[in-house]
């Protein structure tokens, strides 16, 4: 069963100031915890567009949301297609959009999906099982330089070069096929002293490969910039991130649209063209409560940012 404990469930939805007849978009349906909480607040005129690139998540969500199916439109797609999705549904603007980024618990906990460095499985890490690129191709076919780049950029791994060299040496003998084979190779590239601190030694490289396989940061940047144009004035966007790269990107995008263009000096009245597109509802990100942490250890790194559309 696809069981997933949603992080900061109440805060993410409550900050959207739900209108009972509003139209909302869940860009990361996952275990549908946030969706269920939101749908309980909508009347029969309200609507939720539920997007996920994982078909398994969508099928399980249909069971979780079975009492609300008349209010939900399920979409199997990448959230970077947000504008196209809404256009196809003939929806101009929505009342709110939210994101719960990162891998859902079921994806991590089902060994066959190949996301976890604790369980042995074929290298995969595809959120969308229909796409061709998997972790196997990244590990066995990408160049040394490309591996160094993603390990450093997406994993912030300081031993990127050493790990990439070990991968290169191993795959010349035979392909690296499973998650635990890769873990062993990663450990070879990290000095023993460094392996003993900072969590699991493979954590950063696995994160980097997962982000590369699913093009996560680029997809999120594309999507949230579209979301800013798709939400009505007064509507809001909630984003939960789980690592510093996502959080930094979200903060930068919100800041950029909050700033607006430079205003020429001497204008008695500021034209609307120079007013900001949005305002950040919370200057500092909201973090998980003790209750969240007790229910889900993955909430420890979660941060919530919220923006309200002004024009």
Swiss-Prot record:
GO biological process: rRNA base methylation
Catalytic activity: cytidine(1402) in 16S rRNA + S-adenosyl-L-methionine = N(4)-methylcytidine(1402) in 16S rRNA + S-adenosyl-L-homocysteine + H(+)
Binding site residues for S-adenosyl-L-methionine: 32-34, 52, 79, 100, 107
Keywords: Cytoplasm, Methyltransferase, rRNA processing, S-adenosyl-L-methionine, Transferase
Extent of the signal sequence: none
Molecular function GO labels: rRNA (cytosine-N4-)-methyltransferase activity
Listed GO CC annotations: cytoplasm
Chief location bin: cytoplasm
Pfam families: Methyltransf_5
SUPFAM superfamilies: Putative methyltransferase TM0872, insert domain (SSF81799), S-adenosyl-L-methionine-dependent methyltransferases (SSF53335)
Keyword Transmembrane helix tagged: no
Function description: Specifically methylates the N4 position of cytidine in position 1402 (C1402) of 16S rRNA.
Database matches in PANTHER family: 12S RRNA N4-METHYLCYTIDINE METHYLTRANSFERASE, S-ADENOSYL-METHYLTRANSFERASE MRAW
Family: Belongs to the methyltransferase superfamily. RsmH family.
Protein name per UniProt: Ribosomal RNA small subunit methyltransferase H
Lineage start: Bacteria, Bacillati, Bacillota, Bacilli, Bacillales
Gene (UniProt): rsmH
């Amino acid at each position: 069963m696809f069981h997933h404990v949603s992080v900061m469930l109440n805060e993410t939805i409550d900050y959207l100031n739900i209108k009972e007849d509003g139209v909302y978009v869940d860009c990361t349906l996952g275990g549908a915890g946030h969706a269920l909480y939101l749908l309980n607040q909508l009347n029969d005129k309200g609507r939720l567009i539920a997007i996920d690139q994982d078909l398994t998540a969508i099928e399980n969500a249909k069971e979780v949301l079975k009492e609300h199916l008349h209010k939900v439109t399920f979409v199997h797609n990448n959230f970077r297609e947000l504008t196209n999705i809404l256009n196809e549904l003939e929806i101009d603007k929505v009342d709110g959009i939210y994101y719960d980024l990162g891998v859902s618990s079921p994806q991590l906990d089902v060994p066959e999906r190949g996301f976890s460095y604790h369980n042995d499985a074929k290298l995969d890490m595809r959120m969308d099982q229909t796409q061709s690129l998997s972790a196997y191709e990244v590990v066995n076919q990408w160049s040394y330089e490309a591996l160094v780049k993603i390990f450093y950029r997406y994993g912030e791994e300081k031993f990127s070069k050493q790990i990439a060299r070990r991968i290169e040496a191993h795959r010349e003998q035979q392909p690296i096929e499973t998650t635990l084979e890769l873990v062993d190779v990663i450990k070879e590239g990290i000095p023993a002293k460094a392996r003993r601190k900072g969590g699991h030694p493979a954590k950063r490289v696995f994160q980097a490969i997962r982000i590369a396989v699913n093009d996560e940061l680029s997809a999120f940047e594309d999507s949230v910039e579209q979301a800013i144009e798709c939400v009505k004035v007064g509507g809001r966007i909630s984003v939960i991130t789980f690592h510093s790269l996502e959080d930094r990107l979200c903060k930068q995008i919100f800041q950029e649209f909050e700033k607006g263009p430079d205003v020429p000096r001497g204008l008695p009245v500021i034209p609307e063209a120079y007013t900001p597109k949005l305002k950040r509802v919370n200057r500092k990100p909201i973090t998980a409560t003790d209750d969240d942490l007790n229910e889900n250890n993955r909430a420890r790194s979660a941060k919530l940012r919220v923006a309200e559309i002004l024009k």
